[in-house]
Amino acid sequence: MRLYTQVVAASLVATLAIVDSKVSNAIAGQGNNLRFLRQDNATVARVSEDGERGGLLADEKDIMAIADHLIRLNYSLSYARKVLGKFANYEYAIAKVEEKIKKRTVSYMFLDEKFLTQEEAEGKFIEWILEGKTQEQLEREFDIFTRPESKRAKKIQEVNKFAIRAYLDWLRNLRARSFRMTMMEYTNPSNAFATFDRHGHSRNKILSMFDAWVAKGTLLDVVKDRLGFNKPMKPADMFHSDNFVAYATYAQMLREKNNSLRPPRLDSVSTPSN
């Protein structure tokens, strides 16, 4: 019996480690690098055109594994609906996602003497990405490695550790999307790196435009409007939108220019020793 349990457990671990290309292809173009899971080729399959239901069919267990993955990576409810909606039998998973998201709407991060909700924290994630914040900077700013002296301090530290991990997930997601778009430029130049003014533009064209805008000192807020972020959006929806990689790219280019124009810090100038 024990051996049987070990075999089943090992099988489950192997199952959850498999990337299902069929499901990934079903959500291609959504602008993310999620890994989607399956049990076997027969479990996840597209319903035939003659079938009564559209989308993909999968076991409830597999769909819930995907839902849990979306929750772990801090995707918004609207984005979870978009992804899970690719399945014909997704309603139960959506209900579970809604339930779990409601439970984590408080104590997501502690900043400026108050606990933030998930949406407020993710708004900070957007700011950090545009500022180029690194893991080391955040760990230093949040004083992650100081031993907490009270239960409240310990809770604050644990909450902020989780927030930093969530932010790093966003950075990994952004790097993967940026890399994929870079590869698209060489494999299929018709794929757009960004879309605005009713047209899709290639990566080379966008970077050329960005170079000109940086030289003129075009503000980030102006580029934000050009890329279609002028309407109120939830931070997670903004992050997962198709133009966000371009937006973050311009922010980085602008930072690099501004940093190059700053005079050197006095404490960083080496002095000859006597």
From Swiss-Prot:
Protein name, entry field: Secreted RxLR effector protein 40
CC terms in the record's Gene Ontology section: extracellular region; host cell cytoplasm; host cell nucleus
Record bears the keyword Secreted: yes
Phylogenetic lineage: Eukaryota, Sar, Stramenopiles, Oomycota, Peronosporales
UniProt note: domains: The RxLR-dEER motif acts to carry the protein into the host cell cytoplasm through binding to cell surface phosphatidylinositol-3-phosphate.
Motif (RxLR-dEER): 35-53
Subcellular location: Secreted; Host nucleus; Host cytoplasm
Protein origin, superkingdom: Eukaryota
